[in-house]
Amino acid sequence: MLYYMANRCRRCGACEAVCPQKAISSQYASPFRINRKQCDRCMLCVDACLYNALQISGEWYTTDQLMKVIERDKCFYGKDGGVTISGGEPLSNGEFVLEIFKRCKAQGIGTVLDTTGYGDSGLLEKILAYTDLVLLDIKHMDPVLHKKWTGVSNELIHKNAELITSTVETRISLPLVAGVNADPENIHATAKFAVAHGVKHIDINPLHTLGAGKYHYLGKRSPYGRFRTLEKPELDEVAEIFHSYGLQAGFGRMM
């Protein structure tokens, strides 16, 4: 992805001059613009920018390149460490994940898959054969509301959850958003889902706004203004509901 950081830009015009698609307008008389539909992501503008106002977010890796990074850090993993692949959704690059996990296990490196469970079941089953732990993101239990907030049904997710929890140790990761999935009804439903699938631990991940700046860099409007941050007493109430079902519940990474 192409980031634009306005506070670093000097409007020198170097990026506009090298853009083969004419997708950049950097004239002082008007706001700096990137036509992202016109941009073909050649990234020549990034190379031309002397002030790092234009940057590439993310890197492309082959399996060999990524394994070199993983092997380089192997001395830090110790007995219980290893590699976690998350996303986005790792199952959207499932063949890549499968190859990395195979090579990790061949070297005795622990593997963790952080997934929503939304992906091809056959490929998921292959990946699970080389997975030590799954962090299963459960966004919402209600199928209608799940589709409203995520754009997809949770039917496939629930199907794959059966496969995951019957195959590999699993923890549920709950990204918690006020007004979306933090109501008691959904928390109770999530707890029942966990118990029914033999899951013992819930990681509660409250919404934060640390990623708001990234939307700005991408020329997009941040959605975070629509949602408030949950207060500690509210979070404690959520944890207590999970505890009442005999589940371990703690606050994991902030989402």
Where are these regions (language model features)?
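C-terminal accessory regions of radical SAM enzymes
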Residues: 185-197, 214, 233-255
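Conserved dinucleotide-binding and phosphotransfer motif residues
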Residues: 22, 52, 106-107, 245
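N-terminal pre-triad scaffold of radical SAM enzymes
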Residues: 1-14, 32-41
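Short, flexible active-site recognition loops that position polar ligands and cofactors
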Residues: 224-234
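Conserved AdoMet/S-adenosylmethionine-binding subsite of the radical SAM
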Residues: 64-217
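Short glycine/proline- and charge-enriched loop/turn segments
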Residues: 216-225
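Iron-sulfur cluster-binding cysteine motifs and their immediate structural context
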Residues: 14-34, 44-60
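Conserved beta-strand termini and adjacent loop/short-helix elements that scaffold enzyme active sites
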Residues: 57, 205-207, 252-254
